Structures are given as C-alpha cells and as structure tokens.
Amino acid sequence: MGQKVHPNGIRLGITKPWISTWYADKSDYANNLNSDWEVRKYLADKLQAASVSKIVIERPAKSIRVTIHTARPGVVIGKKGEDVEVLRAAVSKLAGTPAQINIAEIRKPELDAKLVADSIAQQLERRVMFRRAMKRAVQNAMRIGAQGIKVEVSGRLGGAEIARSEWYREGRVPLHTLRADIDYSTSESHTQYGVIGIKVWIFKGEVLDGMLPQIEEPKQQQPKRKPRGK
C-alpha cells in the first residue's frame, strides 16, 4: 500500500525547523510541553480570524517568547497594540513566566499550505463547489511562484451518500527528495453533510545551502562493434 510519511516530520532538522525551540531538564519538560499546548490552543481559538499559519515558541532564561506567523498582522495587533497586549498578559498567565509576543507577517499567503487549506475549508462551508475551490487555490499558488502544488479533499463531497477522495495537482511535488522545500498542512471543513478533510502540499523549490554541486562524470564511449564477416 502506498502510505505516505508526514512531509514535515521527515524533514525536521534537514530543511524544516522545530516550532518549539527550548531545552528543559526532566523535572520541567512535561510542564513546559503542557504549557506549550495550552498556549497554542488559546491563541488558535482567539485568532481564528487572523489567518495564523504557525506559532513558534521559545523559552530563553525563564521567560517565554511567542512568534505568531500571520497574513493579517493588523487583526492580531489591534488598535494601538491593545489586542496584542491582552494576548501577552494571557500567555504570561498560562505559562507562569514573563511573556513576549512577536508578529511575523506572511507576505505570500497563496504559498502557505495552512492558509491555503483553511481558505478551501471556508469556501466549502460557504457551499462553493469543491472542484472550483481546489482549482482556484492551485492556480493562485502557481501564479505566485510555486513549483508545484497538490490539493486533496476527502469526505461527502457535494453531499454525496458515499464518502470519497479527490485530488488535483499541478507542477511537481517530490515527496521523496529530502532537500525539497515542501510545505504540508491540513484543515477541516464542517458542512451540513459532515466533515470534509483538506490536505495541501506546496513545493517551493530545493534547499541547496551547504551542499556540494554534483558534477556529472563524462560517459565513456563504447567501442564500435565491427560488422560480422569482416
């Protein structure tokens, strides 16, 4: 069976960084991990309308630093920074340490797998045809500069009695190439017929930093065979 490994997990430490970067002793590790989970859950609930792609958590010197990657930084910051100050106080209370909130803007949301998946999910909830939503997402990504994109939707598509999966791909998406920069994410669309799952793979190019260029060896020409009888 053609089962696929998680594209982000297999590339951790190769082309993908971790989204939690801290070190802790055995006694503190479980508490920090639980604190990370609570902070992520709180921010995901609070910032549903802010097009948040990912949340990176660092813990320098008995404090917590949270970087929110979003396509709509104005929604996160609020008027004169009021909203971000509320978030900072809430994160500090959840983590039990001083907190710092940083905002990182995503300039090209069409090339972010999480934002593309969420966009398709919202369209399906508004009863847009799933094929049209998939095709629009693929065309936008390729127009902005993706080298390849694949979108898969699964569930009771179009209200069908039997659930099925359909996918659409353009360009190339090399899942086996570890140096390939592939952004992968999932989302769920809650429709009146049930839940529809969305998966998105976006291939942005190859990461070649620190790699030696491969020089092709010249092929040796085989001697020509003499015809028989001469």
Curated annotation (Swiss-Prot):
**Which keywords annotate this record?**
Ribonucleoprotein, Ribosomal protein, RNA-binding, rRNA-binding
S-S bridge residues = none
Q: Does the keyword Nucleotide-binding apply?
A: no
Q: Which GO terms describe its molecular function?
A: mRNA binding; rRNA binding; structural constituent of ribosome
Tell me where in this chain the KH type-2 domain is found: 39-107
Q: Which family does it belong to?
A: Belongs to the universal ribosomal protein uS3 family.
Q: Which PANTHER family match?
A: 30S/40S RIBOSOMAL PROTEIN S3, SMALL RIBOSOMAL SUBUNIT PROTEIN US3C
This protein is called Small ribosomal subunit protein uS3
Q: Which organism is it from?
A: Shewanella oneidensis (strain ATCC 700550 / JCM 31522 / CIP 106686 / LMG 19005 / NCIMB 14063 / MR-1)
Q: Which gene encodes it?
A: rpsC
